[in-house]
Amino acid sequence: MSDSRAEDEAAIQAVLVDSYKAWEAGDADGMVADYTADATAIMPGSLRESRDVVRENMALAFEGPLKDSSTYNKRLSLRFVGRDAAIVVSESGILFAGQTDVPDTGKVNATWVFEKRDGQWLIAGYHNSPVLAPGQ
């Protein structure tokens, strides 16, 4: 990997870490700070069509069912698509208040789409889908 790609990979990882830390703090503004204005987020049963909509939904969730939660994230891959785009695939899950492990039934495969704008890596899209339990 070239030095510039290594720097890009580190910058993308930093964006993800910042988003995870903001989630743990219940900070919806911080969680979407590195989202593009036109970012989309798709999760089972929902489509959120902008950074503002994602922020609004997360703020409500952090006051309710996601209060005091954090996330489990294991990066499975990162690949670049041209000079200014990248895709990260991870296994993720929500650790609800008091949980120390995410049960297999709570894990998702997540896809993060990154775009480099004005030299900064930003999240342009997010999608997740439940991980099938063994034997399914």
Model regions: which residues?
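Basic/polar N-terminal segments that are highly enriched at the extreme N-terminus
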Residues: 1-10, 135-136
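A solvent-exposed, acidic/Ser-Thr-rich amphipathic alpha-helical stretch
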Residues: 9-15, 28-84, 91, 104-105
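Short helix-adjacent coil turns
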Residues: 19, 26-27
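Solvent-exposed loop/turn segments at secondary-structure junctions
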Residues: 48, 94-95, 129-131
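A short, structured loop/turn motif at beta-sheet edges
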Residues: 78-87, 114-120
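Generic short beta-strand segments
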Residues: 89-97
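Short beta-strand edge/turn micro-motifs at domain boundaries
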Residues: 107-136
